[in-house]
């Protein structure tokens, strides 16, 4: 399999916005090169998770090796490395770009360039990839290829004179794409003589073989009889098998520089074979690892609690298993008076959080409650000391701290300019600071804002989509911490603080949020035998309060006429009982109440 010369290898990836037809194009390439037989073909062949097919997004990377006989009658090996298009997974994109020499930039001919595409194109340019613009969906009635070409030139500055028009659905232009890959994407550098280095660009957990690592050999070669060393984790392993993805795994004996393959070596967890790590040989290791390896840091945190306390051990086990295949997921145990035992989890972003939650519920059959998402705050205790906190309920009281700083992001929103006003309104509501506005074309605009991350992680994306009929797209990156007038808003139910409902809000918004929280809880908490006060407080100051009246048993029903003093005695006894109950009683807050309030919190 591997006797092909380096000059005949082409490694490429596909960059596209969600829904611009990347997975369909990948399917079509697999089909046209005869890699996948017609009968085995299914829609979105490379998106292997059910969740990916359902949401129509690519989450985990896949890779496939295709053989293609070009017009010059030479046979080439094309390695397609699939990339996710969503902003949460940008680290997955950056590492797959590192494994390629070229990229197909797929743009929907009826929609134009979107924010995510742009972010990934810049990553590709940083990695010096050859970019081939492809206009997909040219068969649609609304497609305007010329206008979009002009847009690509204006926004990205790419020459589109030899852009390819194609329709992945009907198969138009697929041959041109394959030819362009062969002609325009440079072959890998021939570095077989150098010490072995291979870049891990993906890994997943297989319950039988341990972690399966996808890698690209950068220099030297890997033989299946060797012992390997992972340079970042300093661990060594004996190889069980190495092979290629075609797109099903096929074992081979050896892989050379420039080739893409997989290996299994009984590795226990994905954390040991971190993506971006360098594989080298144990006996003759390389001097230094490949550059650019970063661990992915979580930006969004939330609590995950099982609805049934007995499921806590199952949740622990399933998080451990999920972490085997998702190295960006971080978690630690947490307890809460209201929710019992659970975990505090860190995610790359909101989509990542939703996907982890869905995978836990779907693949491990758990029923979960998720607390409101929060970000990492920097709390300045005094001039010298500061701490970082990801759980709002652990922030120290006002007298123990000087100020709270929150993370800010620089956000770029791309949209048709008729939605300019509504988008500016949305950013203002979310405490955004206006930086700049640029007209890309006559009818498309870029808005640049600096905005607190906490305002973005709740439902900013949904709001932006609904206010612009789905036309806007956005992209953001962290720019640092800033001081703000932030307060910790607590919710007290029967004078006890409900931790999961604690949030950090801006002082100006605190009253409104507190008011709506207590009103919502009043509707949702069932009546008890005693009166329940519900309060929202900042420190020791109550800013909003409601109370749920007690259920009242009619103790006088058996008195008929009777003496007034007898009635008074019974009522007094009832009042005494209620008082004792109020002191002793615990209010069971139903999970629906938490869920509804968390939605409202956003």
Curated annotation (Swiss-Prot):
Binding site for GTP: 19-24, 136-139
Domain (tr-type G): residue spans on this chain: 7-189
Catalytic activity reported: GTP + H2O = GDP + phosphate + H(+)
Described function: Required for accurate and efficient protein synthesis under certain stress conditions. May act as a fidelity factor of the translation reaction, by catalyzing a one-codon backward translocation of tRNAs on improperly translocated ribosomes. Back-translocation proceeds from a post-translocation (POST) complex to a pre-translocation (PRE) complex, thus giving elongation factor G a second chance to translocate the tRNAs correctly. Binds to ribosomes in a GTP-dependent manner.
Membrane topology: Peripheral membrane protein
HAMAP family noted in UniProt: GUFP (MF_03138), LepA (MF_00071)
Pfam hit, one: LepA_C
Keywords annotated in UniProt: Cell inner membrane, Cell membrane, GTP-binding, Hydrolase, Membrane, Nucleotide-binding, Protein biosynthesis
Family: Belongs to the TRAFAC class translation factor GTPase superfamily. Classic translation factor GTPase family. LepA subfamily.
Main location: membrane
Subcellular location: Cell inner membrane
A molecular function GO annotation: GTP binding
SUPFAM superfamilies in the record: EF-G C-terminal domain-like, P-loop containing nucleoside triphosphate hydrolases, Translation proteins
Gene3D superfamilies (UniProt xref): 3.30.70.240, Elongation factor 4, C-terminal domain, Elongation Factor G (Translational Gtpase), domain 3, P-loop containing nucleotide triphosphate hydrolases, Translation factors
Biological processes, Gene Ontology terms: positive regulation of translation; translation
InterPro entries referenced in this protein's UniProt entry, alphabetically: EF-4 (IPR006297), EFG_III/V (IPR035647), EFG_V-like (IPR000640), EFTu-like_2 (IPR004161), G_TR_CS (IPR031157), GUFP (IPR027518), LepA_C_sf (IPR038363), LepA_CTD (IPR013842)
Gene encoding the protein: lepA
Protein name in UniProt: Elongation factor 4
Enzyme class: hydrolase
Source organism of this protein record: Prochlorococcus marinus (strain AS9601)
Transmembrane parts of this sequence: none
E.C. number: 3.6.5.n1
Any Gene Ontology CC annotation: plasma membrane
